[in-house]
């Protein structure tokens, strides 16, 4: 596959311009895992996205995105880039203690697919971890050790934010990841229409 710069992607042997990529990005839909609990906070988050959203079962992660390509096909980041959202440090402590095996298996599935995961932790910071400013028996050293182990073991990034920033951050991550993915994506070529096939269509 040819590697292209930000100005173009390959479509059936033809270069697609930056403007055409921008047009495809306008069709972007954020996909939300249907296991995200249906709460007023979730509803507020979803309706704050500057694009459409839909709920669907994901193999890993809580959020990803898909677009409609010029040939009408869907292109998804579900096996490439996802966002894993945590409400606070207390929730991530639960993932690293009570639910550690299940949590690790989810990241193992992402790793097997070659996917990148953004771990978005609301209402937290490295400083709060250091001070133990959360509700859990997990020590600051253990929590720090688990988070840095995940960084070393998996293709992931840990981002801290306020809960009011979650919607636009998820959208920003997925929008620019989608742009990068499209830049290096080669669309399937449509079969060339020959005189014979045209004549056969007329007969039909």
What is each residue range found by the language model?
Residues 81-87:
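Conserved catalytic cores of phosphodiester-cleaving nucleases, focusing on short active-site segments
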Residues 1-78, 90-204:
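Non-catalytic C-terminal interaction segments of nucleic acid-processing enzymes
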